[in-house]
From Swiss-Prot:
Any one GO MF annotation of this record: lipid binding
Taxonomic lineage of the native organism: Bacteria, Bacillati, Actinomycetota, Actinomycetes, Bifidobacteriales
Gene coding for it: atpE
Organism per entry: Bifidobacterium adolescentis (strain ATCC 15703 / DSM 20083 / NCTC 11814 / E194a)
CDD domains found in the cross-reference section: ATP-synt_Fo_c (cd18121)
Protein name listed in UniProt: ATP synthase subunit c
Alphabetized UniProt keyword annotations: ATP synthesis, Cell membrane, CF(0), Hydrogen ion transport, Ion transport, Lipid-binding, Membrane, Transmembrane, Transmembrane helix, Transport
């Protein structure tokens, strides 16, 4: 294999890594938002507190997603 072919393979693997880095947080966000809606439906008086906690959780999940993308660029 020559160097150009190896560079193309490495580039393709990076794209796969980006996709995998987006799948986990996407699933996590769906579960988080769904459970927040479910909790608000069960106890409407806690809706504002659950919403605050949900946004805090969203921030943490998104940081993990961005970390995956940044680490892929650093390499």
């Amino acid at each position: 294999m020559d160097i150009v072919t190896l560079a193309e393979v490495a580039g393709n693997l990076n794209v796969v890594g980006y996709g995998l880095a987006a799948i986990g947080p996407g699933i996590g966000l769906g579960i988080l938002i769904g459970k927040t809606i479910e909790g608000t439906a069960r106890q409407p008086e806690l809706g504002s507190r659950l919403q605050t906690l949900m946004f805090l959780g969203l921030a943490f999940v998104e940081v993990l997603a961005l970390l995956g993308f940044v680490l892929a660029f650093i390499k």
